[in-house]
Amino acid sequence: MSYADFLDYWIDTYASFNLHYSTTVSYINIIKNHVKPRIGFYKLFQLDTRLLQEFINKIYVEYSFSKNYMASILKVVKGSLKYACYTLNYINSNPAEHVHAPRIDKINNDPAHIFTQEEIERILDRFKGTHSIYYSFLTAYYTGMRVSEVYGLTWDCIDFENKTLTINKNIIKKNQYGLPKRRNITKGHSVGVWYYGDCKNPQSRRKISIGDTLIKALKEYKKEQEENKKFYGDSYLYYYEKKVLNDITKKEETKLIEAKGELEVALPKAELVFVKDNGQFLGTDSPKYAFKVIHYELGINSRFHDFRDTHATRLIENGADIKAVSQRLGHSTIQTTYNIYVRVTNKMETETVNRFEEYTNSLDLPKTEDKPYLT
C-alpha cells in the first residue's frame, strides 16, 4: 500500500472519528498540499526516519512555515504512521517516532495584527452600510469570539436582559458527504452546506458577559432584521435545522436547510444573527471579501482572527485577570492565552519600565567620584 492511499484510509477511519472537524480539514489540506506530492508515492515499508526527517527539513527551508504549522505537519506524519504501526500492525516500527522539526531560531512570522482604536473606527465606518458585516465585526471585537462562533450565533444565545452571550456551537461548511467544502470553479466561490458544529473544546462552551455598547448595537440590529423580514416578505430567506446522520462518522448532526419564505414544517427555525438584508446566510464566507477591502482599500493587512487577538491583548494590557480572559476566550488552559493571544504592546512595555522606576524611586543613588585625572 502506498503512503498516499494509507493517508486516505487514516483520515476516513481515524481522523474523522477522533479529531475535531476543523482539525481534520486542516490535516486533509496538509496531506494534499505537502505530504502526498513529496512522499505519498512511497510504499509504507519504504518510509524510514532519514527520509521523513529530510522531508520535514525541506518543507521548513522552502516555506519557512510557523512553528505551529510545522507541528501540524509532523502530527499528520507521526499520527498516521503510529496508527499504521501500533493499531494496524502494517509496519514493524514507527519511522516517524524520532523525527523532529528543525530547531532554528527564526524571525517571528506571526501574521497577527493588533488593531488600533483608529483602525477599528475606520473599518466599522467603511462597512456601516453592510449591516451583517458591521455588526459581526463589532461582536468579534467586543467579545473575542472565533469566526465560526460569531457566525454560528443564533438570537436565542443573546440574553439582552442579563447582558450575556452563550457560545454553545459553531458553524462549519461541508459537502453532502460530510467532507471539507469544495471550490466551484465556474462560480468562483466555495460550494457546500452549512452545519452546526461542536465547540473546539469543552471550555469553548461558555457564557460571557457583554457591555452596554454591544447590547445596544445588537438590539438595533435585531430590530432592523425584523423590518427586513416584513420588507422582503415571501422572498426573505429562512433557515431550518434538520437532524441528519453523517455518512462517515455515523453521528447525528444538524444541517441548515434554506427556504424562501416561511415554511409550515416540523423543523425548528434557525434564528441566525448575521445574515444579509434578504436573510441569506453566508456563514464564515461573509467576511472574506470584506478583508480584501480592508487590506487593499484601507491599507490594513489583517484577518478576522485579529479581532480575537486584539480583544485579548487589550484586556491584558488594561489589567484584566489572565484567568478571566482565558475563560472568556474559551481556551483549554491559561498558558494558551499567554502563548498565542497576548502580545507585548508598546503600552505594556512602557508600563513595565514605569513600574520599575516607581519601585526604585526611594533608592538613594550615591554620586560617582570624580577621577583624579579628569579634574
Annotate each PLM feature:
Residues 1-45, 50, 226-269:
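N-terminal DNA-binding module of tyrosine recombinases/phage integrases
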Residues 4, 11-83, 109, 280-286, ...:
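N-terminal core-binding DNA-recognition domain of tyrosine site-specific recombinases/integrases
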Residues 45, 91-93, 103-125, 174-191, ...:
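DNA breakage-rejoining catalytic core of tyrosine-based enzymes
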Residues 63, 125, 129-133, 143, ...:
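Short, basic (Lys/Arg/His-rich) helix/loop patches that form interaction surfaces
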Residues 82-95, 120, 140-180:
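Short, charged phosphate-coordinating catalytic segments
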Residues 105-107, 114, 171, 329-354:
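Catalytic-site neighborhood detector that most strongly recognizes the C-terminal catalytic loop/helix
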Residues 157-164, 300-301, 320-342:
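Short, polar N-cap/turn motifs at the start of nucleic acid-interacting alpha helices
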Residues 162, 169-205, 214, 227-228, ...:
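C-terminal secondary-structure termini that scaffold catalytic or DNA-interacting sites
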